[in-house]
Amino acid sequence: MGLTKVKHIILVLSGKGGVGKSSVTTQLALSLTSAGHSVGILDVDLTGPSIPRMLSIEASKVTQVPGGWAPVLVHEADESKGLGSLHAMSLGFLLPKRGDAVVWRGPKKTAMIRQFLKDVLWDETDYLLIDTPPGTSDEHISLAETLQKDATLGQVAGAVVVTTPQAVATADVRKELNFCTKTNIRVLGVVENMSGYVCPHCSECTDIFGSGGGKSMAEEFNVPFLGSVPMDAQFIALLEEGQRPTYPSGTTVGGKDISTKETETRTQEGNLVDKYQDCSLSHVFKDITDKVLVNVGG
């Protein structure tokens, strides 16, 4: 099985689309690699694979090796910087064109997910993050059944559930938490995404969608609340254009001053994980990642 060398498997779930689940998956991966862990991302959102674009590796192709597929390298480990390696696998790498639609019925989706779990040959990996489709569909059932059958005892660490502050999103995520209960998947915690907006021109962070819905839901279900993540236009520019984030004087996120100092010169050189260190959200996700590691026991 392709998961033999994987220590911990973490599912990233959401009750509905549009809550930024793939963004959370990407930033968890970047945060974990920054902490020195070797990380893999398996994108099983078959009809909307966005991980290749998030990681700026859309042009990459999967390599066939004896026994299966080798995941795509995002960046190598660098012990001198305390950086772990990052690999990814997605159906997006297998499509002839980026805009090609995946029009598959349930059985074909189920077969593809099982093939991903069995035939993608991960090297020594501390954490494998599985980016799932929104809701509780055939893909989720197939994923849970295959992991229960093939994963070793304790290998599936649990799930991180993503929501936004609005009531309509938290209502759908309640179904996801119930799904975890029925499939015996431990909930590592809830992330409230899009909780505030960091203005690119000043230091103000505004709760345009409200706040607190994710924390209230976590308390209701007696599961850990991992933290709130604001929206940051600089993070989007980093993913879309490769721009290193910079912030005006007085910008604070989570009580931390992340202003770009006037005497500081930031070049546009470096890979994604290097530039992400200058993003306001890297500080937010460091706290979230620390809580996830404690809950996993890693």
Swiss-Prot record:
[4Fe-4S] cluster binds at residues 199, 202. GO terms for cellular component: cytosol. Pfam families: ParA (PF10609). GO terms for molecular function: 4 iron, 4 sulfur cluster binding; ATP binding; ATP-dependent FeS chaperone activity; metal ion binding. ATP binds at residues 15-22. Binds 4 [4Fe-4S] clusters per heterotetramer. Contains two stable clusters in the N-termini of NBP35 and two labile, bridging clusters between subunits of the NBP35-CFD1 heterotetramer. Its cofactor is [4Fe-4S] cluster. Residues 246-266 are annotated as: Disordered. Its main location: cytoplasm. One of its GO terms (biological process) is iron-sulfur cluster assembly. Keywords: 4Fe-4S, ATP-binding, Cytoplasm, Iron, Iron-sulfur, Metal-binding, Nucleotide-binding. Belongs to the Mrp/NBP35 ATP-binding proteins family. NUBP2/CFD1 subfamily. Component of the cytosolic iron-sulfur (Fe/S) protein assembly (CIA) machinery. Required for maturation of extramitochondrial Fe-S proteins. The NBP35-CFD1 heterotetramer forms a Fe-S scaffold complex, mediating the de novo assembly of an Fe-S cluster and its transfer to target apoproteins. This is Cytosolic Fe-S cluster assembly factor CFD1. It comes from Gibberella zeae (strain ATCC MYA-4620 / CBS 123657 / FGSC 9075 / NRRL 31084 / PH-1).
